[in-house]
Structures are given as structure tokens and as C-alpha cells.
Amino acid sequence: MRVSTPALIATHLGAVAVGWAVTDKRPVDEQVKHTGFFQIDTTKVLATTVESLRDENRLLVFSYKGDARVWTERTKWWLFGGRQELSVPAVVNYYVDLSDLTLADVSFNETAKLVTVRLPKLTIGDVAFQLENSTTINGGLLTWDDDQVEAMRKLNYVSARRAMVAQAQQTGLINAARRRAIENVSNYFEIPLRIAGRPDVKVIATFR
């Protein structure tokens, strides 16, 4: 099993920080403006960061590369049979839908100097097969029929997709993706806070 984790994109992080420092002139959202915990400058930083993250829509946080090995058999008139084996590598991406993030998911404790962010649930993207690296082995009389070969190919790819989704849902991979999401989003909030002169504020992200 091979796992690859996409590096945090520095340009995106810079965009969040610069977006706050240069362009933000909007009033603070009323739902947090009068909570009694937020200082106005910190609130503006957090509000702008949330909007920037929402603009990201789906944030890619983790990728898994695996291999599906499946096979299928067919018979015709109880006399002729065919078998096809398929081995195909594929990549599955993990996302957090940040368009669902709101200021209600962000809280700030000035005394503890702590920002808490509640993240939307982790989602898994579609399976991206690497067809150029796939291997197919056909056997049996039915494999002389191109239509039968194509029918078995379609069945095998359905099975391969299911196999990859099952692999991607393993607890170890889900936990790794969640950890990466927490690290990425925490960094998204910490950088503009540091620029705003609040390096003392710690950010903790958790899932809802």
C-alpha cells in the first residue's frame, strides 16, 4: 500500500494572509461581533479567513494510491467460457468541503488565546484509474469475441472501483487524511493571525 500526501500549497496560504492584509474592509459578521470573547481585530482576521476558505470550496487534503486486482468469468450456452483478469493502479483523493464552513464553526477564547475551528466532514473523491499502467489478461474461448471481452472489461472496472473505495475507507487512511486536514486548516488560520500581530494565538481544528 502506497500513500502520498499533497504538500500544503504555500501560495494559497499566502493568498489568505494577503487577502486579509490588503483587501478586507467589510464589517464583522453580527453573529460573532458581540459575543464578548472576540476582540475586533482578531474577529476581522478570523472572518476574512473563513471567507477565504469558503472560496476554496473543496480543499484537497490527502491522496491515496493503490492497486485493484479483480477478475470476472462468463459462460455461454454452458459450453463456452471466458475469463478476464484486471490489475489497475488508481488514486483516491480526500477532501474537506469548506463551502460549508461558517463563522458559527469558529470560536475564540481570549483568556486562553485559543481559536477552535469545527470542520465539515471528510469526503472521498472519485477513483482516478491510471489506465496506461493497467494489465489485462484474457483467457477462454469467449475472449475471441470482442463484445464479450468488452463486457468483461466493464464488469471488472466496476469491481475495481468498489475495491478502491473499500481500500480508501480503511481506518488508517481516514485518520491520516483527517490529521492532514486539521494541520492544513490550522495553518490557514495561524498565518494571517501572525501577520496581524497575534502569534500568541493557538489554533485547534476538530471535526464536527
Regions found by a protein language model. Give the residues of each.
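Domain-level marker for long, solvent-exposed, non-transmembrane regions
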Residues: 2-208
